[in-house]
Amino acid sequence: MDVTRRVVEAGSDEHVDAAWELKECIRHEEAVLKQRRGFFANAYRRATVHLLFAGVHGGEHGSETDDLIGFAAVRRDGYVLFLAVDPTHRGEGFGRKLMATVADEHDSVTCHARATNEAAIDFYEHIGFEIKRHIENYYEDGGAAYYLKLGGGGLTDRLSEFMRR
């Protein structure tokens, strides 16, 4: 599969529609990523967004005609606002690749995960994140969250090095 990486700098909403559609697909299937469109679009525009596209022959790489595989929207301080990978492409290393890119660019990487989202928590722990605290009523719907942080610099370096191979 031909995979193209694109980066959308803060202040742009390039590819926001494709990211929204992927987020909504995941929300409908898994009851996570429940943010409203306005909140999502605003956060997307304030973040640097790393996107992975599966190329469609004859299309411009990373264009809206390509299929969005996944994306990570990250604040300047390394806080991951959104991480989403198309369910049909999970287990293929795309989430790790996105997070390795984030780890390469930030000294500290943190995020929240819905406490009931066991798949996300398992993923984050597998790549070296540690649960730092549990927060009740974190989400608008009253759902609890875990605050996670990528372990010390050694783990960040190892994750980045692992993904460069």
Which residues make up each language-model segment?
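Acetyl-CoA-dependent GNAT
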Residues: R6-R90, R96-T101, L159-R165
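Conserved acyl-CoA
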Residues: K97-T110, F123-H126, E130
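Short alpha-helical
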Residues: E14, E118-A119
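Conserved GNAT acetyl-CoA-binding A-motif
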Residues: D104-N117, I135
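C-terminal "cap" of GNAT-fold acetyltransferases
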Residues: R114-E118, N137-R165
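Conserved beta-strand segments that form the floor/walls of ligand-binding pockets within enzyme
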Residues: Y79, A84, T110-H112, Y147
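A structural microfeature
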Residues: I69-G70, R133-E136
